[in-house]
Amino acid sequence: MPDISLLTLVMLCVAAAAAGWIDAVVGGGGLLLLPALLLGFPHHQPAYLLGTNKAVAIVGTSAAAVTYARKSPVDVRLAVRIGAAALAGSALGAFFAAGISSEVLRPVIMGVLLAVLAFVVLRPSFGTDAPATGPVTARRVAVAVGVAGLGIGFYDGLIGPGTGTFLVLALTAVLQLNLVQASATAKIVNVCTNFGALVMFAVQGTVLWSLAVLLAVFNLGGGWLGAHMALKKGSGFVRGVLVVTVVGLVAKLAYDQWL
């Protein structure tokens, strides 16, 4: 276990649980956990934080993928095709992540956070509206493999936060899936991106395993709670919490970066 204060450890456990909670409902749990790791380990090499984040995320994402697969019809062949490309893309992204410094990583994460915040604010119906459906053509599948697979997979391995949300958006727009189908497919693809990146981080020895195991337990618990709360209160409640949390994280990261 890294040498950290009890307060920092508690903060990370809460962030891991909250990340699992949000991931289970709307995706984007990495938007909480990775910034929290950056705040908890401001002088640590970012590659170790990225690798630890992946080790935690794959546990909650796998559980969510199983849940979605049981409750929603999923085109497994399509998900596997996109997932295979995503695995390759994420492994490549993780390879380049070793050279990223915290001075570069913080502004990038802030940009991602602001982009997601703008989308959530401008699209308050996200998660409740019903996108148009249509036939999945070979061309659309190819675009999905390129964008959701290689492109977002590379981003997930390189940085990570927001990948689940980006996957849902891309799959909905490109394949014209409804939101439930897109979420189900995204979870399967996200497991592949997490696995590809985690293997690369593990090979490079940039995973804090003892910390990851502890945080994974809280992430899994948060995901279980999130699934049940989503059924009771709806995704609008979680989106509100996400907006408040993202604003707070952007403010703190900006303070650490420039003040």
Stretch-by-stretch model annotation:
Residues 1-9, 39-48, 95-104, 202-210, ...:
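Helix-coil boundary and interhelical linker segments in multi-pass alpha-helical membrane proteins
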Residues 1-45, 131-183:
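Selected transmembrane alpha-helices and immediately adjacent juxtamembrane segments
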Residues 9, 54, 110-113, 117, ...:
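Residues within membrane-spanning alpha-helices of integral membrane proteins
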Residues 11-15, 19, 23, 34, ...:
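Alpha-helical transmembrane segments in multi-pass membrane proteins
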Residues 39-40, 94, 98, 107, ...:
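Transmembrane helix-loop junction
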Residues 39-43, 85-91, 116, 139-154, ...:
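Small-residue-rich segments of transmembrane alpha-helices in multi-pass membrane proteins
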Residues 51-104, 108, 194-244:
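Selective hydrophobic functional segments
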Residues 63-73, 94, 110-136, 248-259:
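Transmembrane helix exit motif
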